[in-house]
């Protein structure tokens, strides 16, 4: 379960970076060259999704919970926004949903 969770976090980080770099280019007038590492990051994101040991629909559903938590960590660390009780509560609920889905893999 720990390996799967870490793989989910790595997958989410690649997706967030792959989307953040074009955002910097479009919203903050950053270099267009950021699109190159963004494309690489998104390709890595897709490849990482293929490493998960379950049906794709289950992967995407469980991944959503980890993505929420990773995005909130990004909000805190990169954007410098203090997380609220609502952020923490939502992340906990999303992560619980992910854990329930992952725990059910192979049991059906």
UniProtKB/Swiss-Prot annotation:
- Which residue windows are transmembrane per the record? 6-26, 31-51, 61-81, 85-105
**Protein topology in the membrane:** Multi-pass membrane protein
Ordered alphabetically, the record's keywords are: Cell inner membrane, Cell membrane, Membrane, Transmembrane, Transmembrane helix
Location within or outside the cell? Cell inner membrane
Q: Which SUPFAM superfamilies match?
A: Multidrug resistance efflux transporter EmrE
One annotated Gene Ontology cellular component of this protein:
plasma membrane
Q: Which Pfam families match?
A: UPF0060
Give the Periplasmic membrane side ranges. Answer: 1-5, 52-60, 106-108
- Residue ranges, Cytoplasmic side: 27-30, 82-84
- Its main localization is membrane
Q: Which family does it belong to?
A: Belongs to the UPF0060 family.
The protein's name in its UniProt record: UPF0060 membrane protein YnfA
Q: Which gene encodes it?
A: ynfA
């Amino acid at each position: 379960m720990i390996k799967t969770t870490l793989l989910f976090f790595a997958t989410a980080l690649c997706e967030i970076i792959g989307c953040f770099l074009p955002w910097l280019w479009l919203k903050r007038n950053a270099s267009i060259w950021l699109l190159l590492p963004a494309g690489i990051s998104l390709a890595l994101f897709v490849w990482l999704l293929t490493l998960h040991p379950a049906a794709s629909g289950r992967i995407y559903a469980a991944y959503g919970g980890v993505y929420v938590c990773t995005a909130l960590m990004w909000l805190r660390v990169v954007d410098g926004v203090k997380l609220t009780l609502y952020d923490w509560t939502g992340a906990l609920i999303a992560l619980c949903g992910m854990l329930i889905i992952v725990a059910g893999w192979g049991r059906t």
